[in-house]
Structure formats: C-alpha cells, structure tokens
Amino acid sequence: MYDSLDFDALEAAGIANPRERAGLLTYLDELGFTVEEMVQAERRGRLFGLAGDVLLWSGPPIYTLATAADELGLSADDVARAWSLLGLTVAGPDVPTLSQADVDALATWVALKALVGEDGAFGLLRVLGTAMARLAEAESTMIRAGSPNIQMTHTHDELATARAYRAAAEFVPRIGALIDTVHRHHLASARTYFEGVIGDTSASVTCGIGFADLSSFTALTQALTPAQLQDLLTEFDAAVTDVVHADGGRLVKFIGDAVMWVSSSPERLVRAAVDLVDHPGARAAELQVRAGLAYGTVLALNGDYFGNPVNLAARLVAAAAPGQILAAAQLRDMLPDWPALAHGPLTLKGFDAPVMAFELHDNPRARDADTPSPAASD
C-alpha cells in the first residue's frame, strides 16, 4: 500500500514519524502533493491541513509589495494600504506575499478607482474586507459545528481530519460562485431601492430608519446556554430578515440582538416595525421586541447610514418599553391616520432639547389596503 513512499527520505527531509503517519502521507501523495510541499506543511505544523489549505490559497506568493506596485502602476504604500483595508496583512515589504490572482484582483480596484475616485474605491475595499471577514467567520463556525471531524482536537486522527477538511474546502470555489450570483441580485435590488430615495447626485438619501432589539437581552444571555442563545439569535435574525424584506425594506446591519433597516416610505417603515414587534415567533418564545423609528435625509456611505434621523431612531429604541414602537414626530406627521399616542417629551442622549415621540400601534385599515380583495384578484 505504501510502496511509492520512501519513509527514510521523508524522515530525512523533516517529516516526523513518517511510518506511523503512512495513511496521511499516502493520501497526500495520491492528491498529487510533492515531498517539498509536505515538508513545508510539516514545518508549519499543518501537514494534516495541507489537503484543505491548498484550496483556500489564491495561488503561490510571487509578488512583493514593490513588485506588485510596479505591476499595478502604484506606490508600494498604496498597495499596502489597499491590502490593509481588506483586513489582510503581508509578512514584510520584501517578502513574496501576493499571488497573481491577488494582483489581478487589485487591478480591478485600480480600474474602479479611475472610475469612481479614490475615496469611493478605498471605501469599497473597507466594506469588502469587513464583509468577507464576517462571512469567513460564519463559514468557519458553521463547518466546525456541522463537520466536527475537521478538528484534530475532536478526531485525534490526522487522516480523518485531512479528509474532512478537504471535503469542506472543496466548497470554496462553489461558494465563490454563489457569492457572485447573490451579489448580482443584491445590486439589482439596491439600484431599485436607491431610485426611490435619491434626490440628487450626492450620497444623501431620504428614507425611513428603523432599529429593533430584544428587550432584556442581557438577562437572556445569562439564563441561556450557549446552544440556546445560538438558536435564539439564529431564529431572531431569520425572522427579522423575512419581515424586513417582505415589507419592502433593506437590512443594514445586525448589532448583537439589534437590527437596523431602512425603508423607502414611512408606511413600509412602520409596517416592518409592527410586524417585528408582533411577530408570532417572538410571542411563542415569550420574547418582546421593541423598535425606534425616524424619517429624513441621511448620508448613505459604504453600506451604512449616518445623520440625525439615524441617531434619533437609535435613541428611541433604547427608550422604548418592551413591545413598544416609538416614532419621531416628523414620521408621525407623515402618517396622520396611523393610530398613535403622544409619548414624551423624552430626554435622549446626544440631543440638547427634549424630543417628542409617539407610540405607534397596528393599523388594520392600512393592512387591509395592502391586501388585494378577492374580486381584485380574479
């Protein structure tokens, strides 16, 4: 079975106990890895990980910062900054670190910079790096939990871990294709959304801002096991995503147990808040959601939103009682027929003067107006 392996040569090259690890070494040999590649992996303490690691790499490191800069027509400092904004590091300015694929990817950024300007292009790198880092962490957590054999601490068997890791890593290019497809759909959705909220060529938009969170979340984290907390947050995130999208909104971000979203109209903003607070899943789990809402002109930058309406909505959700929706006065004025009770004035952090708010309730008439009648459906 191991006739093709020269154990003495492998041991002399630096691979410890090759005969005891014959199964792993044969597996790597059958995958086409050279002795040199195995030795390098052994030096990194990752011989068991070589089969999967190679599928994660973008290619052999052939460019230093200086040679990559020459290839791209940039300074080495610009290349280093771009790589840093992506959340990535290089071993040193003169150490080959970047692959051909890395440099080709940066060439796309260089071309984009010429189209949209330096600030926009650098901002995109920051967003991309943050998003990819979060995605990578989510994937890693998913794989560790769903395929425990990927961990040596679980199997205590290098060959079993190598096979499991390889099977998981083979999804990397397929997930890349999935990302490309989903990205295209989200670009089309974002274009449609922004067409409804932009007023000029600036980055400012006029829209509704919503925040919602789980009441007494700190107490929940102390009462639940990690597994129960994971299930709770997973279900909450899924419910929020479904509700916001169903009501025509766009998710901006999750912050622990809180979510921020934007809506193109006051009606859609409030409908999403009502559906979140009254969500049957939350009631079944005996959870209480609260929300804070505002409407106005904000700065849309790098996938996030900034401005007074954002600050106001964030402060209102913090002031809301469990199961309560607090809306800014301007939003209330835009929905005169929506059931509301005056609440305030409130003293909110960051606001010099007390702020008038309104507690909003469900509006069955608005819901009925959104639902086609049987006759209209025929």
Curated annotation (Swiss-Prot):
It comes from the Bacteria. Pfam families: Guanylate_cyc. SMART domains: CYCc (SM00044). PROSITE patterns: GUANYLATE_CYCLASE_2. Residues 208-317 form the Guanylate cyclase domain. One of its GO terms (biological process) is intracellular signal transduction. GO terms for molecular function: adenylate cyclase activity; fatty acid binding. PANTHER family: ADENYLATE CYCLASE, TERMINAL-DIFFERENTIATION SPECIFIC (PTHR43081:SF1), ADENYLATE CYCLASE, TERMINAL-DIFFERENTIATION SPECIFIC-RELATED (PTHR43081). This is Uncharacterized protein Rv2212. It comes from Mycobacterium tuberculosis (strain ATCC 25618 / H37Rv).
